[in-house]
Amino acid sequence: MNIPSIENCDLHNKAVLLRVDFNVPIKDGEIRDVTRILRALPTIQYLVNASAKIIIISHFGRPKARDNNLSLKNVIDTLSQLLNKKVKFIDDCVGEKVQKAVSAMDAGDIILLENLRFYEGEKENDANFARQLASLADIYVNDAFSCSHRAHASISRITEFLPSYAGFCLQDELKYLEKAVSFKAKPITAIVGGAKISTKIKVLMKLTEKVDYLVLGGAIANNFLSFSKVNIGKSFFQNGVDDLLHNIVETANKNNCKIVVPEDVLVAVNSDYSTSISRKTESILDGDIILDIGSQTLSTISSIIASSKTLLWNGPIGVFEHSAFASGTIGVMKIVSDLTHKGKLTSIIGGGDSLSAISAAGLTDKDFTYVSTGGGAFLDWLSGDEMPGVAALQKRLD
């Protein structure tokens, strides 16, 4: 894909507005997964070495108003430690305080601004807010693939006001995902998990046209089991989507894509998540809640993956946050990692929950061919949808 790269511009002593994705999971004040911060480091370090003045912007969570729990101040210490360099935090995004801080910067300095989503103009893709952000810098760099499916002020609108380029993380994401969706190395298996099937209808339709096996997990699998007249007890599923499921099944049959759903499951009874009970799918009871795949399904999925050349994975297979229901997700993760290390499988994994699952399995992104930082962005890319952030950069070449 042809997009402008930061390697093709003069950065010396220039103020660079760098859009990253520091929307990292935090619990009890601790960052649980630093993957997204790590992915931004090569671009930040490149800008430092090029003697630029780096102004970092990001969103964090989904605040409805200013909220200290969702302040980017929470990541400043970790960022400084990883860079081995002092990063100054400014508790605003625009305005006089920020302008003064930028004016005082020397080449190689780094400042981190406050959460973009504390401002309504960000999600509204507001031109005035984008213009205010742009006034801080000489150059804009997008290094947030995971946000580039959003038409937000700091992602797409801002490119109207500044020379705009892609950072290394964004470039890497596009390179690997373009390779993945070329669908050349067959057989291809896709694993799709998660809660709401309605958010993944488009990508499921696309995948049934391209892959050999579509493995379903999570509540999405519950929907398909229910559609097949299997009793799913009290398990979570989405109502009113049977017509969509029918279309997916028809498309899969037409394209010789085998849809794989659990043949056995691990369930909780009476919402007791501390203990799992194994059931064949035909033996699920009315009070059961399906929270993971069973051992036979894990074996089936393992065999399918072992026969594949390419794997695409979005969303966990089970509720891995509870140890009693983590064996499916972690088991498949370890099989995929092993085959990847042996050079037998190209593995592309995407989605915020997937990053957490990798950590839960005691693995890192180095154990797979590529781990995308994107969730919705990953799905949109697989679906073939235009991504506003990427399209905005491409327009700069016109």
From Swiss-Prot:
Record keyword Transferase present: yes
Annotated keywords: ATP-binding, Cytoplasm, Glycolysis, Kinase, Nucleotide-binding, Transferase
GO-annotated biological processes: gluconeogenesis; glycolytic process
Binding residue positions for substrate: 21-23, 36, 59-62, 117, 150
EC number(s) stated in the UniProt entry for this protein: 2.7.2.3
Subcellular location as annotated: Cytoplasm
Residues where ATP binds: 200, 321, 351-354
Enzymatic reactions: (2R)-3-phosphoglycerate + ATP = (2R)-3-phospho-glyceroyl phosphate + ADP
Root EC class: transferase
Keyword Cytoplasm appears in the UniProt entry: yes
Gene3D superfamilies with a match to the protein in the record: Phosphoglycerate kinase, N-terminal domain (3.40.50.1260)
Family from the record: Belongs to the phosphoglycerate kinase family.
Subunit (UniProt): Monomer.
Protein name (record): Phosphoglycerate kinase
Name of the gene this protein is made from: pgk
